[in-house]
Amino acid sequence: IITNKGFWLIELLCVLFYSAVFPFIKYAADLMVQKYNVDPKLAGTIPGLLPIGAIILTPLFGSLYDRIGKGATLMIIGSVMLIFVHTMFALPILNIWWFATIIMIILGFAFSLVPSAMWPSVPKIIPENKLGTAYALIFWIQNWGLMGVPYLIGKVLNNYCVIGGDEAMAEEITG
């Protein structure tokens, strides 16, 4: 397993992908309020589209993978979608709820596409008698990422983000 480059690429994708999705979902409701001016009572609705989309789309993408193969291509497409989503959420464009909804739906596609191709790809590159170790190693490293990324997000938010809009910023500057 240790010398299998394909395994390490899947491992890297797994830790980066899930570390870019799960912590984001934790902070997404606050993002909807702060950036998109969504009512706090409804702010969880937009990120809530993600699991609903995954329920519908993951079996469909799994079936697609079974029919056409092309696991690497499907994982790349899903990863590019994820990068696009995070870029759109990071840029100061279209700060309106419907834009956030569309971007969250695209994230739902990525969140379904990558795992439906990634997990069945592992047995294609790892011998059957090593699959338990391979999956355990994948989850072990993934959990390191899921532990570390929220910590890093918290550090960034605490050190570099101003919350409260123009009035709060002006008050901080002028005292």
Range-by-range predicted roles:
Residues 57-70, 157:
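Helix-to-loop junctions at the C-terminal end of transmembrane segments
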Residues 31-36, 67, 121-126, 159:
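Helix-to-coil boundary motifs at intracellular loop junctions of multi-pass secondary transporters
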Residues 128-162:
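A late C-terminal transmembrane helix in Major Facilitator Superfamily
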